């Protein structure tokens, strides 16, 4: 399924195991991986993710996404994931846990907001 719409993606993320985020095989900067991660998807992207560089670096360190330079490698990896449910489930779990920890942990968000308020000029 290829989707090129705005505003409908969460519906598709909920029914997908694997999500390829476009705008990343050309120098467009990639797309935000947070929504598919929190919806328990394996995230696959190309190398041009500079709009979300820090997030992707964290996800790569935690085995929560795949970044590919070549379409041929991408095809092989997708086939392997569908053949190995353990790897797919582990990646889905990693991406969801990482996203929950970094973006939806209320204690962490309060800490960040408090620090921003303390350093913000009046």
Indicate residue ranges for each PLM-predicted region.
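Nucleotide-activated sugar donor-binding and catalytic core shared by glycosyltransferases
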Residues: 1-122
């Amino acid at each position: 399924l290829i989707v090129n719409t705005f505003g409908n993606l969460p519906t598709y993320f909920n029914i997908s195991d694997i999500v390829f985020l476009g705008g990343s095989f050309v120098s467009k900067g990639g797309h935000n991986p947070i929504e598919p991660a929190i919806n328990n998807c394996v995230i696959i992207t190309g190398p041009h993710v500079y709009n979300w560089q820090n997030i992707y670096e964290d996800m790569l360190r935690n085995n929560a996404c795949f970044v590919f330079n070549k379409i041929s490698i991408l095809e092989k990896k997708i086939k392997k994931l569908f053949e190995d449910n353990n790897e797919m489930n582990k990646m889905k779990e990693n991406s969801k846990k990482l996203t929950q920890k970094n973006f939806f942990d209320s204690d962490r968000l309060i800490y960040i907001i408090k620090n921003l308020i303390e350093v913000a000029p009046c």
